[in-house]
Swiss-Prot record:
Protein name: Probable cytosol aminopeptidase
Co-factor binding details: Binds 2 manganese ions per subunit.
Top class in the EC scheme: hydrolase
Designated gene of the protein: pepA
Swiss-Prot/TrEMBL keywords: Aminopeptidase, Cytoplasm, Hydrolase, Manganese, Metal-binding, Protease
InterPro entries: Leucine_aapep/pepB, Macro_dom-like, Peptidase_M17_C, Peptidase_M17_leu_NH2_pept, Peptidase_M17_N
Taxon lineage: Bacteria, Pseudomonadati, Pseudomonadota, Gammaproteobacteria, Aeromonadales
Signal sequence coordinates: none
Annotated family: Belongs to the peptidase M17 family.
Record flagged with keyword RNA-binding: no
NCBIfam families named in the record: PRK00913.1-1 (NF002072), PRK00913.1-2 (NF002073), PRK00913.1-4 (NF002074), PRK00913.2-4 (NF002077)
Native organism: Aeromonas salmonicida (strain A449)
GO biological process: proteolysis
Main location (coarse class): cytoplasm
Amino acid sequence: MEFSVKSGSPEKQRSACVVVGVFEPRRLSPVAEQLDKISDGYISSLLRRGDLEGKPGQMLLLHQVPGVLSERVLLVGCGKERELDERQYKQIINKTITTLNETGSMEAVCFLTELHVKGRDTYWKVRQAVETTKAGLYNFDQFKTNKAEPRRPLRKLVFNVPTRRELTIGEKAIAHGLAVAKGVRVCRDVANMPPNVCNPAYLASQARRLADSFDNITTKVIGEQEMAELGMNSYLAVARGSENEAMMAIIEYKGNADAKPIVLVGKGLTFDSGGISIKPAEGMDEMKYDMGGAASVLGTMHALAQLQLPINVIGVLAGCENMPGGNAYRPGDILTSMSGQTIEVLNTDAEGRLVLCDALTYVDRYDPETVIDVATLTGACIIALGHHTTGLLANHNPLAHELLNASEQAGDRAWRLPLFDEYQEQLESPFADMANIGGRPAGTITAAAFLSRFTKKYNWAHLDIAGTAWKSGKDKGSTGRPVPLLTQFLLNRAGVDIEEKE
C-alpha cells in the first residue's frame, strides 16, 4: 500500500475515486460543496432525494459524476459536524477503507483528513488515517489454505491537506504512521501465531531476525544454562514444566552513543496453561496471547529502528512456557529470585510476575534511564478497566505522566492506578520474603506491588495489557497494543514534539 499527501481541489483530481464527507442531516462538507458546484447540484439533489443522510459510517458510491474528472466519488457519512471526535474519525476512516477495498478502486484521493476533529491537528489526522488504514486491512491468514483476497484491492491512497505549507507535516505524519503500523503488524503477526509454532525459541528467532534487518540493532539470547548461572531461579521455575526451553532475548538499539538506555521488558509466556494451578479449558486457547507484552516490545523495537530515533533503547523478550509437567513448580514452593529475595508460590498461574521479577533485576546492569515492563498480567485489570484501556502503575510520577500523555497523543489509552505502600501488606508470607499473590482485592495493584520490590534502583512503570492485547469473539486476534503508546513515548523522548511538526 502506497501513501502520499497533496494539496489540491477535489474537482481537479484524476483518480479512481475521490472521498469526501457529508454531515448529518444531509449537509455537505466544504470539499463536497466544491464537487456539488462543479456538477451543477448533482450531489445535493441526491441528498434531497434521501440517498444519504450523513449518519456516521454511511457510504454512497457515485459513478461518473458530471464535471468531475475522477471515475468515482465516495460520499462518507460523518455524523454531526460539531460532534466529530477522534474515535468517530477513526471509525469513519476504517469504514471508508473497507468500502474502497471492495469497490475495485485501486487508488483514491481522500479529503477526510481536512475534516475538523476536536482537539486534533493535520499531523494527527493524517497519521491516524495511515495507522487505521493499515490496521483495517490487516488479515492473519498464514494457516488458511483458501485465502480470500479482493480482485482489485486498494493500492494507493493520497491524503489531501488544506494548504501547501502543511505538506511537510503530512509527509512526516505518514512516515511516523507507517513505522507505528509496521510495529503493530509485527506484534500482531507474532502474537497470532499458534503456540505450537511460537514457542520461546521462535520468539528469540524473531529478535535475531530484527537484528539482521537493521544495522543499529544487535540481539543476544540467554538460555536456561546462563539463567541458572545468573541465579534467575524464579524465571526458571516457571519454565520447568515445559519441554520448551526458556529463552530471554535482549535487543539493543543504539541511536545515541552517550545516552543511558530506556529499557522495555515484555512478558513472553508463549503459552500459559496455568501450570499445576491449571486454567479452565474454556478459553485456554487464548493463552497463546500471554506473550503479548513481548510481542509489543518486538513491534516497538521495529518501529524505533524504522524511525531511526536518536536514543538508546533495550528491548527484552522474556520468553517462557507455563505447563503442568512432572517437573513443574508447585503451590507451596519457595523460590530464590535473582535479587536474592525469596518468594512463596501460592498459585502457579501467577507466573508472569515470577518471570518478570528476574528480568527486571537483570536489566539493572544497563544502568537504565527508565524501565517499562509490558505484560498481560492480571485478569483483575479487565475487571477494573475493561478492554479499552491499559492499566498503568509507576514508582515515578513524571514517567507516569509521560506515558499517559503519549497514550492520549497516540489514541492508545492508558489509565493510572495507585501503588500505595498499604497494598504491599497483602503480599506478606509467613515463610518467605513475599507471596506471589495478594488475594482477590486489588489484584492488578498487588501484582505491580510485587514487581515494584525488584525495581527500586531505577524509574519504572508497568503496563498491564491483559484487557487490551487481544480481542475475543468474531474479531478474535491480537490488537498490536500498546505499540502505538510506546512508540509515541519514544518519539517524545527523542524530541519529536508538536512544535517540530507544526
